[in-house]
């Protein structure tokens, strides 16, 4: 089980560090996991969803969707950390639950794949579609994962929701491109739009950070001293 110090050194997302100094953590945190069980659960889900999604979307769109979903998960997680810091200042009482937390894992990207398959299952089947997707099973699995995120502490549900929203959005664009039979160019444009949305949310988060920058700098300095970073 990696320590908090190890997680920070290996690229985990910690909002004050990510937004004040190292934005690459939005990406690198997708590949770090908190122990073997965390890694195995996400890789099992990636195998289940990914093996179908790659064959449906093609390799390029599959990879693009996966990365955009993971980034959106990290960004929405950061947005929630920002809102918690606003609440911490407004409350005037030190509440540990509102402090930024270290987060990592591929679950946002994986949930994006799950959402993409769920959306496809709910839409009329395309003539060229190679798989019949079980909508009841997919809705149940995705709903259960979301519910567990709200019921169990320590799960970054904001990352899950961000990944799901991006996965659903890019799947709708892919579906439209298949109906129009202009898949290659339209798919590239769709991925660029997805990435642009990530950039916009990142810029929005940077704007929101300005009023809480002194607080985050203080929190970051305290963590660096405690962990001897």
Enumerate the predicted regions with their spans.
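C-terminal transmembrane module of polytopic alpha-helical membrane proteins
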Residues: 146-229
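Alpha-helical transmembrane bundle and helix-membrane interface signal
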Residues: 55, 120-135, 175-188
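Hydrophobic alpha-helical transmembrane segments
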Residues: 63-67, 110, 138-143, 161, ...
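Hydrophobic transmembrane alpha-helices
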Residues: 50, 116-123, 166-175
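Membrane-interface micro-motifs in multi-pass membrane enzymes
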Residues: 99-120, 159
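Active-site His/Glu-centered metal-binding helix of metallohydrolases
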Residues: 40, 44, 75, 110, ...
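Alpha-helical transmembrane segments of multipass membrane proteins
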Residues: 72-77, 115, 148, 197
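N-terminal TM1-TM2 helical hairpin plus the immediately adjacent luminal interfacial "cap"
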Residues: 1-104, 151-155, 218-226
């Amino acid at each position: 089980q990696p320590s908090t110090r190890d997680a920070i050194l290996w690229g985990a997302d910690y909002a004050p560090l990510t937004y004040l100094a190292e934005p690459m953590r939005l990406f690198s945190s997708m590949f770090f996991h908190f122990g073997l069980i965390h890694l195995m659960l996400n890789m099992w889900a990636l195998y289940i969803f990914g093996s179908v999604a790659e064959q449906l979307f093609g390799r390029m769109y599959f990879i693009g969707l996966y990365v955009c979903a993971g980034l959106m998960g990290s960004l929405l997680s950061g947005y929630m950390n920002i809102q918690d810091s606003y609440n911490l200042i407004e409350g005037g009482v030190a509440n540990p639950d509102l402090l930024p937390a270290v987060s990592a894992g591929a679950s946002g990207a994986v949930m994006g794949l799950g959402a993409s398959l769920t959306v496809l299952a709910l839409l009329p089947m395309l003539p060229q579609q190679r798989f019949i997707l079980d909508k009841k099973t997919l809705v149940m699995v995705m709903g259960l994962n979301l519910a567990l995120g709200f019921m169990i502490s320590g799960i970054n549900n904001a990352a899950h929701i961000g990944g799901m929203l991006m996965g659903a959005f890019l799947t709708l664009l892919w579906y439209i491109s298949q109906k129009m039979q202009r898949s290659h160019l339209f798919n590239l444009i769709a991925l660029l739009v997805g990435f642009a949305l990530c950039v916009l949310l990142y810029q929005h988060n940077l704007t929101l950070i300005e009023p809480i920058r002194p607080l985050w700098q203080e929190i970051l300095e305290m963590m660096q001293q405690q962990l001897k970073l």
